[in-house]
């Protein structure tokens, strides 16, 4: 009796499931796929973090393009610069301008209406236009330079209180990048000294962390549609996070509406709302706030921590950067953003950090709106396409001694920059769906890193090498947070006198 009631229906379901998906794929010339795919689950059994390293190993066996099956969802992984060029240029770039749909984005990102989650079309193009012309233009970023400088000065002052002590840098770098973004968007300081509302700040920080933890493909229903009926607890959690975040964003929006003279991104968008309310709805503005606060904070802090870790492990590079800053700027004034153009080695350090330690090693997945071909293989409509930037950045066919930290490699143009070479280095993605905040991210990382080098002498704790292992999550953070020793240089006394004056 048990056999007929339980086992037989299950066997029939598995057979029907396999036949259904086999019939859907038999007409396609799909990229090669690893064996040992499980019924229903597909290749979920292979997913051993860090996933970017796993995909790199699979590419060694199956080639620079291979396919995986996660439940009912097919994924294709790209691991070569030439194939990335095929994805991010021409008609394919348009076809691949959609995002896969995940449960977290449905609730947190206002039903896929934010710039990072919206499907390709008129709404997304309008959001991208707003980002490019209104909130992240060169003029707008220049207007907010005083915020970046003030937050960096505050970080330097906090560091100066703990000279010759072991300092964990991650909290300071996180406060720097969060405050920079939140002040630009709303005018508030949420972390460190002189916060506007400490209780609200703590709630906001936890919300951002919880949303990041839930982001991506965490829910079985994202891959197995029939599992949605069993995923109530996860869905309730995501809904609660979305409601809590929306409550904070709405409150911040209302505060900016009352402060009509404020000089923030939200105030600027509200002024545009007066003339074009159909483009600048409250939901659109909250979605832009959300994207800036979540995507624009963690990545810069992570990159800065990797950069400082690399320099401490390569003291000759740290000394070379310090000499460049001393020769070009000296110890009479602090480094400023216009100086960066005259500091090529500092720029090389940032580029090399982006190469070795991209904050999003698999970029953000895309999904084609129609069947396309990549590398001679079929990529059917709706496939989740991932580009392994981490693997491309370490490809020995593209880079000399790819595992080594060598900022000098960018002096000779090894980093590319035009044509197909632009897809050798792509920490912010490429094509139509590349990160709109790339310019801002580079500005804050380069200025903050230059300031840390100019203002302090740095040493490793107990002379021990810095561990460069990454965590297994979607964002490539350091597994062991960076701790270091610092000693103030002469410029710090001038900065402190200036701040007191």
From Swiss-Prot:
Transmembrane segments: 288-308
Protein topology in the membrane: Single-pass membrane protein
UniProt superkingdom: Eukaryota
SUPFAM superfamilies given in the database record: Cytochrome P450
The EC number(s) this enzyme carries: 1.14.-.-
Cellular localisation: Membrane
The UniProt record lists the keyword Metal-binding: yes
Residues bound to heme: 435
Signal peptide limits: none
Keywords: Heme, Iron, Membrane, Metal-binding, Monooxygenase, Oxidoreductase, Transmembrane, Transmembrane helix
Predominant location category: membrane
Assigned GO CC terms: membrane
Cofactor names: heme
InterPro entries: Cyt_P450, Cyt_P450_CS, Cyt_P450_E_grp-I, Cyt_P450_sf, Plant_Cytochrome_P450_Monoox
A single GO molecular function term of this UniProt record: heme binding
Pathway: Secondary metabolite biosynthesis
Role summary: Involved in indole glucosinolate biosynthesis. Catalyzes hydroxylation reactions of the glucosinolate indole ring. Converts indol-3-yl-methylglucosinolate (I3M) to 4-hydroxy-indol-3-yl-methylglucosinolate (4OH-I3M) and/or 1-hydroxy-indol-3-yl-methylglucosinolate (1OH-I3M) intermediates. These hydroxy intermediates are converted to 4-methoxy-indol-3-yl-methylglucosinolate (4MO-I3M) and 1-methoxy-indol-3-yl-methylglucosinolate (1MO-I3M) by indole glucosinolate methyltransferase 1 and 2 (IGMT1 and IGMT2).
Family: Belongs to the cytochrome P450 family.
Name assigned to this protein: Cytochrome P450 81F3
Source organism: Arabidopsis thaliana
């Amino acid at each position: 009796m048990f056999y007929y009631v339980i086992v037989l229906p299950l066997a029939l379901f598995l057979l029907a499931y396999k036949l259904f998906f086999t019939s859907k794929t038999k007409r396609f010339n799909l990229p090669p796929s690893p064996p040992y795919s499980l019924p229903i689950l597909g290749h979920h059994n292979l997913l051993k973090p860090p996933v970017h390293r796993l995909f790199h190993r699979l590419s060694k066996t199956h080639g620079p393009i291979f396919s995986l099956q996660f439940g009912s969802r097919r994924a294709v992984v790209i691991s070569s610069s030439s194939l990335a060029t095929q994805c991010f240029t021409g008609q394919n770039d348009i076809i691949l301008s959609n995002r896969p749909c995940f449960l977290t984005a449905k609730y947190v990102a206002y039903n896929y209406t934010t710039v990072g989650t919206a499907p390709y079309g008129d709404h997304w193009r309008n959001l991208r236009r707003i980002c490019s012309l209104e909130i992240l233009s060169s003029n707008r970023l220049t207007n907010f330079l005083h915020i970046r400088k003030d937050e960096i000065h505050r970080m330097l002052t906090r560091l100066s209180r703990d000279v010759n002590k072991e300092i964990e840098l991650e909290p300071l770098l996180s406060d720097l990048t969060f405050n920079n973004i939140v002040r630009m968007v709303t005018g508030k300081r949420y972390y460190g000294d002189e916060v506007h509302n400490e209780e609200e700040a703590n709630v906001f920080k936890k919300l951002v962390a919880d949303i990041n933890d839930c982001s991506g493909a965490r829910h079985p229903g994202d891959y197995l549609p029939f599992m949605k009926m069993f995923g109530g607890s996860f869905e309730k959690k995501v809904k609660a996070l979305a409601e809590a975040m929306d409550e904070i964003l709405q409150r911040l929006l209302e505060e900016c509406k009352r402060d009509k003279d404020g000089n923030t991104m939200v105030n600027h968008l509200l002024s545009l709302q007066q003339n074009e309310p159909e483009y600048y709805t409250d939901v659109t503005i909250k979605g832009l706030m959300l994207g800036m606060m979540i995507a624009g904070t963690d990545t810069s802090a992570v990159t800065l921590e990797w950069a400082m870790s690399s320099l401490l492990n390569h003291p000759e590079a740290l000394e070379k950067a310090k000499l460049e800053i001393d020769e070009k700027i000296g110890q009479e004034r602090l480094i400023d953003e216009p100086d960066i153009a005259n500091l090529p080695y500092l720029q090389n350090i940032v580029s090399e950090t982006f190469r070795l330690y991209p904050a999003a090693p698999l970029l953000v997945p895309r999904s084609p709106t129609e069947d396309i071909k990549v590398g001679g293989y079929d990529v059917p409509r709706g496939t989740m396409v991932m580009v392994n930037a981490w693997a491309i950045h370490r490809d020995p066919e593209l880079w000399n001694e790819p595992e080594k930290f060598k900022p000098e490699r960018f002096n000779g143009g090894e980093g590319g920059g035009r044509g197909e070479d632009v897809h050798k280095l792509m920490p912010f993605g490429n094509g139509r769906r590349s990160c709109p905040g790339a310019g801002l991210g580079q500005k804050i990382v380069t200025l903050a890193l230059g300031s840390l080098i100019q203002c302090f002498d740095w040493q490793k704790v107990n002379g021990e090498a810095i561990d460069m292992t990454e965590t297994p999550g979607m964002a490539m953070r350091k597994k062991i947070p960076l701790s270091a020793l610092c000693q103030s240089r002469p410029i710090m006394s001038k900065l402190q006198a200036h701040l007191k004056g």
